[in-house]
């Protein structure tokens, strides 16, 4: 099926059939979601309140891995979930391990969010082309 699922908190709540309010809930939800057939579950913590946003990677039988990121005060967040999963996929295609792929994808996404432009109505898009040369790996 899929190697990695990347639900945000509301999506994870639906997939797991439970409310998520803390890290223990995230672990229980990730375990339930992994039973759908995915080796890895990355629950994105962007919907939690606070200055720091933490994503949690679950792999059955291993300790949960946390990926920290700053909360950016912007409305230009349209496409962040798709951008993150696509970036992870691109790094995996370059034969990086899952942890490295996620860390690099989060770095890329942070830059794309910071470079996003206002469109005056609703949530604007992230800027996928903010600094592509810096991301090239030789």
Which ranges hold each PLM region?
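Phosphate-handling active-site elements
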Residues: 63-65, 91-104
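Short, small-residue alpha-helix embedded
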Residues: 14, 74-98
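Short pre-catalytic strand/loop immediately N-terminal to key active-site residues, enriched for Gly-Thr
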Residues: 64-78
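Conserved phosphate/ATP/ADP-binding segment of small-molecule kinases
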Residues: 1-64
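Active-site-adjacent loop and "lid" segments of alpha/beta metabolic enzymes
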Residues: 48, 78, 132
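Short clusters of hydrophobic/aromatic residues that line enzyme substrate/ligand-binding pockets
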Residues: 20, 67, 126
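Glycine-rich beta-alpha junction loops
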Residues: 11, 46-48, 70-73, 106-109
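Charged C-terminal helix
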Residues: 99-138
């Amino acid at each position: 099926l899929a190697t990695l699922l990347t639900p945000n908190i509301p999506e994870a709540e639906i997939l797991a059939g439970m409310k998520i309010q803390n890290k223990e809930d995230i672990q229980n939800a990730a375990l339930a979601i992994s039973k759908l057939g995915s080796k890895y579950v990355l629950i994105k913590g962007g919907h939690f309140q606070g200055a720091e946003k933490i994503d949690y990677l679950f792999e059955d039988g291993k300790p949960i891995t946390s990926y920290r990121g700053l909360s950016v005060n912007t409305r230009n967040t349209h496409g962040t979930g798709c951008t993150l999963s696509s970036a992870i996929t691109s790094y995996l295609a370059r034969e990086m391990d899952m942890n490295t792929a996620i860390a690099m994808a989060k770095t890329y996404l942070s830059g794309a969010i910071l470079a996003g432009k206002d469109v005056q109505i609703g949530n604007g898009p992230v800027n996928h082309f903010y600094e592509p040369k810096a991301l090239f790996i030789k």
